[in-house]
């Protein structure tokens, strides 16, 4: 008999049993949770965390409430034991007084053979899984004289220190957007597997690699070559000599069989059986990211057989046919001739096509993964699709995402840039640590390789772009040493492991790099990074940019010019409704102790519970930004004033992201040939100030609505140099063919009256924008305009054009609206727009009308206990204009009564006392 488990959480393969196997899901057993910190036991669950079981038992309040991240520190600082008994033939980590094994990596899959222990067990078996205190363990490792010590000021501690010594979710120890619960417990399922004595196997993991013949990870695949399928199964048990393998591909929609054949070149190495076949003469329908084509998927069944065609293993996975390639090659002569600046590329190509990556960074959606459900993630990914995003960067260090999350991405066409779990720190490079990492890398690369949504493997977060420069600045005499350690871990160890287990995915050693100079897989350091070997006037790599000086937030000259933007942003407050989920009514004001201490920007840097100095800096950044650009809320009711301030911080955040995204998208037609914008960050882990566009629970901030608008296929954008007064209008398109149309320019005062002679600008301007490109359609200077009062003026830009979507012969009409004001919003001579809101019970849509003036930042809001999003929000509405808006309900706990609580406001409301 065999007991299969993954990491300290005891996760195991969930492949069904065959040929007399008996697989027992330990999630169905009765568990108890105990600790010296308690004087009694409570019911436990698997999977679970100690916090969740203590909450369910009524021992603690909601960990997310108030300052419970501080109040409940006794939980992560204690040891916990999960126990189950009265199960015959059960094999524990500690069983019948016998030690079975210890695990030290949350990210690995473990299996333990306990047959001999079972044979000698003369009592009722008890399975006991002990979880030590993660903060205490890493501190003990740090104090060991044999542990590495890094120069002062290098390692980034957010709350609990020394996280880099443990292969556990790094944000469990705290981050600048989340709490430090450091939870303990069996966070994934576990199983008991009993195999017959005859030759038999149980599948642990499956690697399905689908690529073009001759494809190599860092080189562009030849799209004319046939597809190759490499199927590899990891197992426990024993295979007979000379096993056979076969595959079958079946269309998930039609059920039509694409191909069914035996695989040749079957080899058995250790506990893996592998076969490779070329799909000659087979033309599958391709899988495309969102907006570029259909998400065609196939079920692939791999069967392993022995003598007399006896089935030994049978695995079915859902997959798709696509190539995805990160192009970091040098700029070619042909590109130079097109006006692209010299240097190196840094963009993605899918099925041989360049495309613009539009998206954000996803962080852990909860501090406690066992309560993250497929339905919850489906709602989040539906919001990603609704937000016109085709790529998410899966930030490290959270976890390697569950397969069901990749499944959701496969279905929706969301590319997942994935990373190994290292972030903002230097890590050990001793042999034991590297061996542990090697097993982690191999398991996870093989596990998710069949998903067409998988876009990239990156070595870690900001290691090359932040950590190495920090060493160079603070400990220059040790810079060479730590560059060597960086290359030892991320290039000499991880890169070959990736290449050995997939040919379909590119690897980059860090999330942000200047790219590579050379790749030689036979060299001790197989990838030579560029580092400082750059040439002025040339562009390389991707950018990671933050600037919390809000005085330059709308100055595009401070934005980095690069080939791809993988991180940028600014924090804001969540809405009142979200705060009310976690904060008592008396704490609902901007500078309350609870609100301030839930803000972890800037982090405490230790286990301090009085981080008022650092958090006040982050709160101050939001406050100053609002004061610089927007009407300052001053409502008589304290809760209403708090809500207005929260909303104001979201307005600034959204406008700043809009400015930066427009700049990056315009770069697609500039010398830098910029082809990607992934802002920080998609969603929240809890209710607190952060960079998120979607709050904990699913409510959209202003940011997600605005990014959805500016991520449309064809957009018109104003670029204003407020120092010189220059105003340029650009049209940007991410279509694969040219598009043409016109942009209407309409100058109005804020009462909605057209300005005489349209303020000296033409009423409309034609455009013809190239494929994946941008074009300037108009240029002027504010001084040349005939504006009676710049504070009482708005330019409304309305685009209408035609073009073809990628992989479509149908001509499509595209529209987009934008606006420009000659002064910042706080200086505008606002008027009451006289907003009216109605609801049509038949069409289930809302109608908003402005009766008396221009409505800026028109904002529809909905009450608590419902989750969803409006078709449009944060828009400009002109007098007499009616806009019909639908609402997508994702979750409703009000029995439809939420409709009665929908409200509408505009920037004008931010100036009112009530």
Curated annotation (Swiss-Prot):
Residues 1-20 form the signal peptide. The active site is at residue 462. Gene3D superfamilies: Galactose-binding domain-like, Glycosidases, Immunoglobulins. The lineage of its organism: Eukaryota, Fungi, Dikarya, Ascomycota, Pezizomycotina. Exoglycosidase that cleaves the single beta-linked mannose residue from the non-reducing end of beta-mannosidic oligosaccharides of various complexity and length. Involved in the degradation of polymeric mannan and galactomannan. This is Beta-mannosidase A. It is an enzyme of class 3 (hydrolase). GO terms for biological process: glycoprotein catabolic process; polysaccharide catabolic process. It is found in: Secreted. Homodimer. It comes from Aspergillus flavus (strain ATCC 200026 / FGSC A1120 / IAM 13836 / NRRL 3357 / JCM 12722 / SRRC 167). Disulfide bonds: none annotated. Keywords: Carbohydrate metabolism, Glycoprotein, Glycosidase, Hydrolase, Polysaccharide degradation, Secreted, Signal. The gene is mndA.
């Amino acid at each position: 008999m065999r007991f299969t488990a993954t990491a300290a959480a005891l996760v195991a393969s969930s492949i069904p049993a065959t040929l007399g196997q008996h697989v027992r899901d330990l999630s169905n057993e009765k568990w108890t949770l105990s600790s010296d910190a308690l004087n009694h036991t409570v019911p436990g669950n698997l999977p679970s965390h100690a916090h969740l079981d203590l909450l369910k038992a009524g021992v603690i309040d909601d960990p997310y409430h108030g300052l419970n991240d501080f109040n409940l520190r006794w939980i992560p600082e204690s040891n916990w034991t999960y126990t189950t008994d009265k199960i015959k033939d059960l094999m524990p980590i500690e069983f019948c007084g016998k030690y079975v094994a210890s695990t030290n990596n949350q990210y690995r899959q473990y299996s333990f053979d306990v047959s001999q222990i079972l044979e000698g067990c003369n009592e009722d078996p008890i399975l006991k899984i002990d979880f030590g205190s993660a903060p205490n363990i890493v501190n003990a490792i740090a104090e060991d004289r044999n542990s590495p010590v890094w120069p002062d000021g290098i390692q980034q501690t957010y709350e609990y220190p020394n996280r880099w010594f443990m292969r556990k979710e790094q944000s469990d120890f705290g981050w600048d957007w989340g709490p430090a619960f450091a939870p303990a417990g069996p966070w994934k399922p576990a199983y008991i597997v009993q195999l017959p004595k005859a030759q038999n196997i149980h599948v642990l993991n499956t690697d399905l690699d689908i690529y073009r013949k001759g494809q190599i990870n860092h080189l562009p695949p030849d799209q004319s070559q046939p597809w190759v399928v490499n199927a590899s199964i990891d197992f426990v048990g024993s295979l007979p000599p000379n096993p056979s393998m076969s595959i079958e591909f079946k269309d998930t929609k039609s059920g039509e069989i694409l191909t069914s054949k035996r695989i040749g070149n079957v080899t058995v190495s250790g506990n893996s059986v592998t076969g490779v076949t070329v799909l000659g003469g087979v033309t599958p329908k391709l899988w495309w990211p969102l907006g570029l084509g259909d998400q065609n998927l196939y079920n692939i069944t791999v069967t392993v057989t022995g003598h007399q065609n006896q089935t030994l293993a049978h695995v079915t996975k859902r997959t798709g046919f696509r190539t995805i390639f990160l192009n970091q090659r040098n700029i070619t002569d042909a590109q130079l001739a097109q006006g692209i600046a010299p240097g190196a590329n840094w963009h993605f190509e899918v099925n041989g096509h360049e495309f613009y990556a539009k998206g954000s960074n996803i962080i852990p959606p909860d501090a406690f993964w066992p309560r993250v459900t497929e339905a919850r993630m489906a709602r989040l990914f539906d919001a990603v699709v609704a937000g016109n995003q085709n790529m998410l960067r899966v930030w490290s260090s959270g976890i390697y995402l569950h397969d069901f999350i990749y499944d959701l991405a496969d279905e929706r066409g969301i590319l997942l840039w994935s990373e190994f779990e290292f972030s903002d720190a230097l890590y050990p490079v001793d042999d034991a640590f590297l061996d542990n990492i090697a097993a982690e890398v191999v398991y996870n690369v093989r596990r998710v390789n069949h998903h067409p949504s998988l876009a990239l493997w990156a070595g870690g977060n900001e290691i090359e772009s932040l950590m190495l420069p920090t060493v160079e600045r603070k400990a220059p005499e040790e810079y060479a040493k730590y560059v060597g350690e960086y290359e030892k871990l991320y290039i000499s160890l991880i890169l070959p492991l990736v290449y050995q287990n997939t040919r379909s995915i590119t690897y980059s050693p860090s999330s942000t790099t200047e790219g590579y100079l050379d790749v030689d897989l036979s060299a001790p350091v197989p990838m030579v990074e560029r580092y400082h070997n750059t040439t002025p006037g040339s562009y390389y790599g991707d950018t990671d940019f933050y600037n919390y000086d809000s005085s330059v937030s709308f100055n595009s000259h401070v934005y980095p010019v690069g080939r791809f933007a993988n991180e940028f942003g600014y924090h804001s407050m969540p809405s009142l409704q979200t705060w009310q989920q976690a904060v008592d009514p008396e704490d609902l004001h901007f500078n309350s102790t609870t609100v301030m201490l839930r803000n972890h920007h800037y982090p405490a840097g230790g286990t301090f519970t009085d981080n008022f100095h650092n958090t006040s800096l982050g709160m101050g950044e939001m406050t100053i930004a609002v004061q610089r650009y927007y009407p300052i809320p001053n409502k008589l009711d304290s809760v209403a004033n708090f809500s207005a301030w929260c909303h104001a911080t979201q307005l600034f955040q959204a406008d700043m992201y809009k400015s930066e995204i427009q700049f990056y998208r315009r770069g697609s037609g500039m010398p830098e040939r910029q082809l990607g914008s992934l802002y920080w960050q998609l969603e929240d882990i809890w209710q607190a100030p952060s960079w998120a566009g979607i709050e904990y629970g699913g409510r959209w901030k202003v940011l997600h609505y605005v990014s959805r608008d500016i991520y449309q296929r064809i957009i018109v954008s104003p670029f204003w140099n407020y120092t010189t007064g220059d105003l340029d209008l650009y049209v940007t398109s991410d279509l694969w063919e040219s598009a043409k149309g016109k942009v209407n320019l309409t100058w109005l005062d804020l009462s909605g009256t057209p300005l005489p002679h349209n303020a000296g600008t033409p009423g409309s301007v034609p455009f013809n924008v190239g494929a994946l490109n941008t074009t300037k359609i108009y240029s002027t200077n504010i001084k040349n305009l005939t504006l009676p009062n710049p504070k009482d003026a708005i330019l409304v830009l309305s685009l209408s054009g035609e073009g073809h979507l990628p992989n479509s012969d149908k001509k499509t009409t595209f529209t987009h609206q934008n606006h420009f004001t000659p002064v910042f919003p706080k200086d505008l001579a606002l008027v009451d727009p006289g907003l009216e809101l109605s609801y049509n019970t038949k069409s289930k849509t809302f109608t908003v009308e402005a009766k008396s003036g221009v409505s800026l930042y028109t904002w529809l809001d909905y009450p608590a206990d419902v989750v969803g999003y409006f078709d449009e929000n944060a828009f400009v509405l002109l007098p007499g204009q009616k806009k019909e808006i639908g609402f997508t309900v994702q979750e409703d706990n009000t029995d439809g009564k939420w409709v009665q609580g929908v409200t509408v406001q505009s920037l004008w409301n931010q100036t009112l006392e009530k």
